[in-house]
């Protein structure tokens, strides 16, 4: 596509699911976008298997972007990403894995990538509702454009994966990026526990603890010495404004 893309292109973009007839086009696009060679079975799966959410963005009939994702139980997360969610979440908790997200070069920076990502979120809210707690993906450590895209949309780097990719026989490093949704969160670290404890202590009045201890001691003493009259006026006083 050589013609200039108008700034209003997004208003002419339509969304539809990929189908078997799109295989050749999708192969060509993925060859342009990604350095990884996918087997033919992968293209058949993402265009035919209902377990994949495979959405195309089209402009005047041509595919100019697509997203492929799979919503699955947390038990099916690969070992290297097994700690994406805290162990407190049940085994039937779901996650969404983005296998692919790409936009034709001429149509980048027109909001199409964001539209596709938001469409995935809408799909999750409709099908998985609040059972899906995270959206995650893998990216080459050298793919700064993709990294900036996801970081600008609140994805956080979760893991560094050395030698994760094999590209034309050369091993390349990758990152796992995660966006937590619907209350999802990773396992707590020691720092998280310290911060939580600090937050809890910060909500306590610094003088409320000794004041409570004094009151409890006074009550206990009165129960043993009923003849004793202990006046708070002559005792210890604590300011409530400390």
Swiss-Prot record:
Binding residues for substrate: 38, 99, 165
Intramembrane stretches listed in the entry: 193-236
Residues in coiled coil: none
InterPro entries reported for this sequence: Acyl_CoA_acyltransferase (IPR016181), GNAT_dom (IPR000182), NAA60-like (IPR045141)
Chain spans, region Required for homodimerization: 162-173
Record keywords: Acetylation, Acyltransferase, Chromatin regulator, Chromosome partition, Golgi apparatus, Membrane, Transferase
Catalytic activity, reaction form: N-terminal L-methionyl-[transmembrane protein] + acetyl-CoA = N-terminal N(alpha)-acetyl-L-methionyl-[transmembrane protein] + CoA + H(+); L-lysyl-[protein] + acetyl-CoA = N(6)-acetyl-L-lysyl-[protein] + CoA + H(+)
UniProt modification remark: Acetylated: autoacetylation is required for optimal acetyltransferase activity.
Stretches assigned to the N-acetyltransferase domain: 13-182
Cytoplasmic compartment segments: 1-192, 237-242
Database matches in Pfam families: Acetyltransf_1 (PF00583)
GO BP terms in the entry: cell population proliferation; chromosome segregation; N-terminal peptidyl-methionine acetylation; N-terminal protein amino acid acetylation; nucleosome assembly
Family classification: Belongs to the acetyltransferase family. NAA60 subfamily.
The protein's role, per its UniProt record: N-alpha-acetyltransferase that specifically mediates the acetylation of N-terminal residues of the transmembrane proteins, with a strong preference for N-termini facing the cytosol. Displays N-terminal acetyltransferase activity towards a range of N-terminal sequences including those starting with Met-Lys, Met-Val, Met-Ala and Met-Met. Required for normal chromosomal segregation during anaphase. May also show histone acetyltransferase activity; such results are however unclear in vivo and would require additional experimental evidences.
Protein name, entry field: N-alpha-acetyltransferase 60
Organism this protein belongs to: Bos taurus (Bovine)
Gene this chain is encoded by: NAA60
């Amino acid at each position: 596509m050589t013609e200039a893309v108008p700034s209003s292109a997004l208003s002419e973009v339509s969304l539809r699911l990929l189908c078997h007839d799109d295989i050749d086009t999708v192969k060509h696009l993925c060859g342009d976008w990604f350095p990884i060679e996918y087997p033919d079975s992968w293209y058949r799966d993402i265009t035919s298997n209902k377990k994949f959410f495979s959405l195309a963005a089209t402009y005047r009939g041509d595919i100019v972007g697509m997203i492929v994702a799979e919503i699955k139980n947390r038990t099916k997360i690969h070992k290297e990403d097994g700690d994406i969610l805290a162990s407190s979440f049940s085994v039937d908790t779901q996650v969404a894995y983005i296998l692919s997200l790409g936009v034709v070069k001429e149509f980048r920076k027109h909001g199409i990538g964001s539209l596709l990502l938001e469409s995935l979120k809408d799909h999750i809210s409709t099908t998985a509702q609040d059972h899906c707690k995270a959206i995650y993906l893998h990216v080459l450590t050298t793919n700064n454009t993709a990294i900036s895209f996801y970081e600008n949309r609140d994805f956080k780097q979760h893991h560094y994966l050395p030698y994760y990719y094999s590209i034309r026989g050369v091993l390349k490093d990758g990152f796992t990026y995660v966006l937590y949704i619907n209350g999802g969160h990773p396992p707590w670290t020691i720092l998280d526990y310290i911060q939580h404890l600090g937050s809890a202590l910060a909500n306590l009045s610094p003088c409320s603890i000794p004041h409570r201890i004094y009151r409890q001691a006074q009550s206990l003493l009165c129960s043993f010495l009923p003849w004793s009259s202990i006046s708070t006026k002559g005792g210890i006083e604590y300011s409530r404004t400390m």
